[in-house]
Amino acid sequence: MRRWFKKTLPRPPDEEESAGLTNKDIVETNHLYPTITNLSLNSDTSSILFDKNKKPLKPKIIIPDKEFDLDYYLKDETESIQSPFEGFTAQPNFSNFNKQGNTMNREANFQRTNEKIQRNKSIKRVKLFHGNLILDCPIPKKLLVTLPQQTEREFAYMRYSAATCDPQDFSKSLFTLRQPLFFQPRKTEICIAITMYNEDEVLFARTMHSVMKNISHLCTRKNSQVWGKDAWKKVVVCIISDGRTKIHPRTLAYLAAIGVYQDGIAKNQVNDKEVKAHIYEYTTQLSIDPNLKFKGSDRGIVPVQMIFCLKEKNQKKLNSHLWFFQAFCPILKPEVCILLDAGTRPGDQSIYHLWKSFDLNPQVAGACGEIVVMKGKLGSGLINPLVATQNFEYKMSNILDKPVESVFGFISVLPGAFSAYRFEALQNDSQGNGPLASYFKGELQNTGKSGIFEANMYLAEDRILCFELVSKKNEAWILHYVKSAYADTDVPDRIPEFVLQRRRWLNGSFFAAAYAICHYYRFFRTSHTISRKFMLSIEFIYQLATIVFGWFNIGNFFIIFYILTSSLASTSANFLPGEILFRIAIWIYASLLVTCFVLALGNRPHGSPNFYLSMVIMYSILMGYLLFCSGWIAYRAISDAIHNASSTSSSYTSALLNSNVFINIVISLSSTYGMYLVVSIISFDPWHMFTSFVQYIFLSIMYTNVLNVYAFCNTHDVSWGTKGDHFTNNDLGVARLLQKGADVEIAIPTNQSDIDAKYEDAVKLLASPSLEFNSPIINHGEQEDFYKNFRTYVVLTWILSNLFLVGIVLSIPKINGISISNNETSAYLSFLLWSVVAFSVFRFIGCIFYLFIRLCTGE
């Protein structure tokens, strides 16, 4: 039988009480909003409770509940202790029960518990605060009794705010956060944003637990002027989930298990205004590692201030950053903002090293660390050639590309998965122009107001932010690479996911780079020194050359393939099957290229995985033959040079140096790959050369002929792979304004037993084995004709320009072949190979300078 009752609850008269921070004593009560006490935060003491006469109160210790003891979950994996949940532990044990059956039972129990608590919800009359619904909710007692600190209000209560405004109007709508409302407002040094969509609890735990270990490290730096014992009070972690219906249920259970989230509190509407985001604030003292083991203070975990923003609708990652930068950061006013993606695992001291780069150099506006590919236990992931290829690619980018850009002061992209920004540098000017204004301009494409060029450009919006920071008018900001900061991340291990990921990266980076080059003149409006402007000019010439070579990459690769394979067809190569293999290889190459275009224009990678896998395998075989041709030509050139030296009684060295084929092919290729090895050894990170180099060489043709083709053929697709929501749910209920006054009626769970039951069920759900969570199938609507026409223009221009280049080069006999007997090599082939050497030398020198600067600064 339903038990409904109405009771007017007193609401706090000022802003401090709305945050749960007032000068009232703690009173035993069953209300959702009990009278509360002030938190006095001194620099040398922890939070202390005071009575009305400013006298310290004696801490109140709650007696643990014997039926539910979360301390069991705080044990290490090696300790054998029976779980309080009928044999279930926080780590799934597949040997004791059926995976699917028990998980489904847990989910069914979870649903039944929800229904029961829905029936037991009480109708409460609540006074809106400045027209906003703000609730101060007690955490489950079953959680509270396990915490080492129980009396401070930030540990005993979770604060819920129903945001009915857009993020940029958060402060204007009189919403606020806990940090500025303490008796002594807390200063935020670092604010960490973790964005997620539908990542499961393991991926989220990988990031969250690593962040907590980083904060624990900050608390151990006792000799620091900024950090120390209470360093956790200077760090705020913001978790922003993109869509309430998209979040993984087990991730929500994770957040509930550490006290950040409570079910049954949120509402869809407040006073007939649609809720845009549900904001939960809590200072947790627990962490759950990727093995789903609880960790507490005995494992070094310190309290962490957390803000969980659960967006009502799925509005993409850029909108999540809008909430972070425009809603939360203006209130918290952090010195440094760190961006993380759920699933990325920062090193235990990486956040400190990122922050330190800002502390050492006040001109640093943004910084990033090394993105490391997760290779599995004992490097087992490298068995997959696709993972090994990406491992080599990431490593060489972190060894060559990022350091040279850091030396010049402009890094083309700070990866959104792991990067940091100085909040001061992000601010717009008085006219509303600046980095953040440009960064969030991409939000206009959701309303259909942006052009296709801008839409593609904002697929790599982090590149736009980097350019806007360094080119900010009357400022002299620079970007910096921090090698000592690193973060592990998963990479696609299947071709379809890899193709889709690189489509967005390639299109976004191409159009963003074009935008930066076209607006290069803005650097002369900055306050950079003349020497810095000169260095930036050199870097942009390098970037321009990179774009040009990238545009003609598909044509140049075919030219190289044609010249080298046709050279074995000549009699001077002394390779009998050379003519037949040449014709077969060219026909296969052309057929695969046509297939790539057909699939890219009409098929989804997930819909044709076997086609794409077959193409990658065939291209790898062709690459193997190309390597054989290069080796055979080098062998014949060296043999011919030795023979000439013997016949003319000259030295072998002079004979080799007089061989054009040896110099233009052997020396150029050896120089390029030799520099890769040397710079890796100098950087004390050479292992990828031995574990991933061969895989990268064989699959490098895929980057040119598969990824580039798919990317250019899909410039009309400006999606991130997710589709925004355009409907309103009413499943949470509404807070309706009563006729008189500012009171609303809401249905909420108030019985402690119901709150504890919800918490216990969330922990049980987290403890049960995980079933595969299938995301909804995304059904993109038809794109506008304008977008498709733009795609047509881009693809035609790209194909025709490359065909023109191929036709010109291959039609001139003197530059389209190699003759070993006549000591002649293709002039265009020599130009391409030595251009690659020049790019490598440029990056090599930049890397040496970076390592020298790093050594001098002690970074």
Swiss-Prot record:
Region feature (Disordered): 1-22
GO cellular component, one term: plasma membrane
Enzymatic reactions: [(1->4)-N-acetyl-beta-D-glucosaminyl](n) + UDP-N-acetyl-alpha-D-glucosamine = [(1->4)-N-acetyl-beta-D-glucosaminyl](n+1) + UDP + H(+)
GO molecular function: chitin synthase activity
E.C. code: 2.4.1.16
One Pfam family from the record: Chitin_synth_1N
Top enzyme class: transferase
Membrane topology: Multi-pass membrane protein
Single biological process term from Gene Ontology: ascospore wall assembly
UniProt-listed SUPFAM superfamilies: Nucleotide-diphospho-sugar transferases
Compartments where found: Cell membrane
Transcription regulation among keywords: no
Residue stretches spanning the membrane: 544-564, 615-635, 662-682, 793-813, 833-853
Keywords: Cell membrane, Cell wall biogenesis/degradation, Glycosyltransferase, Membrane, Transferase, Transmembrane, Transmembrane helix
PANTHER family: CHITIN SYNTHASE (PTHR22914), CHITIN SYNTHASE 1 (PTHR22914:SF9)
Record's function text: Polymerizes chitin, a structural polymer of the cell wall and septum, by transferring the sugar moiety of UDP-GlcNAc to the non-reducing end of the growing chitin polymer.
Similarity field: Belongs to the chitin synthase family.
The name this protein goes by in its record: Chitin synthase 1
Organism whose genome encodes this protein: Schizosaccharomyces pombe (strain 972 / ATCC 24843)
Gene: chs1
